Amino acid sequence: MAGIRSLVIAPQWIGDAVMTEPLMARLCDRGERVCVAALPWVAPVYRAMSSVAEVIELPFQHGALQWAERRALGRAWREQYDRAYVCPNSLKSALLPWLAGIPIRIGYWGECRLGVLTHRLSNPPRDRRPPMVAFYADLASVDAPSRNPSMAPDPTSPSGLSGPWDSSAPLARTQGDALRPRLHVSAEQLHATLQTHGLQVQGHVVMAPGAEYGPAKRWPVSHFAELAAALPQDVVLLGSAKERALCEAIAALAQPGKTQGRLLNLAGQTSLPQAFALIASAHRVVSNDSGLMHVAAALDVPQVAVFGSSSPEHTPPLSPKARVLWLKWDTQGQPPLDCAPCFKRECPLGHLRCLQDLSPQQVLRALSEPPTGVLARVPTGS
């Protein structure tokens, strides 16, 4: 497959972008030159991937069709790419490869995309879908014929598929290290960021208390504050500008009781590469199920990930240094947490037990114990 020019249309969320890294690695390993088209706020994720040759920042707004702009960009890309891999399931995400006339356009069934994709994979409902990292990596399983003579099919491909294809076969569920996302931070970026904030390597704990999806994925402010006050290390609060107030509330509650170390609220004050550097150099990371959770896993940093309305069986932090706390796994819980995972933005029952009942002491205990592997289930009993 040497010489194949491949365009990947990236997801719009940081966590999803991180989870596409094994797809990039697969494409690169088999000789494809990978160019990623991404919205500006996720583009830095792809610049931290060694398998990506080029990153194009798309001039689009979140949720906007912007037909004229898409058509103009599609025309500018004509004859530049041999294949396109469309990670999101939306129609508008598949329009650019179609408008560019890319001969092979691979993606999942979704949102009336029959005419704009040449190769479509079956798209099971969420409760039957593999972990998202495998879901994205499976886009590389399509062995499509090419109109370009230099793109001969790979005879070693496990799929053995050819021609316009709609798969009804089960998706691959390959496990192991090949599906672990990897990100890289340069030594220069790391040291410059630490120097700016007066921090030392492994001298601070990063807390990422936000979750863009909604409050049903956020461990309570009071719990984060109590944990921050109990830690001997410096604590760095990270998040977007929208999460600045959330982090301010944590800092206000934690500061009076924090007698050791500093508490730095850097939410909205760092670039994404700087946030990567602060995470890469951290002693530990504590987060909800969020984009920065996946960043920590991809940077191989010891972490504790708190899950509420979502499921670690669907979007786990894929790292041997990750520990997952999820009360759904607590068989001694009274009453049992039968409502999780609900995948809702807000608790439909109004109690948010999946997060309220997970104490700071339980998270502190998990932080002090050595990580045991991917999806390590931490006992959540008192």
Regions found by a protein language model. Give the residues of each.
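Catalytic machinery of carbohydrate-active enzymes
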Residues: M1-S382
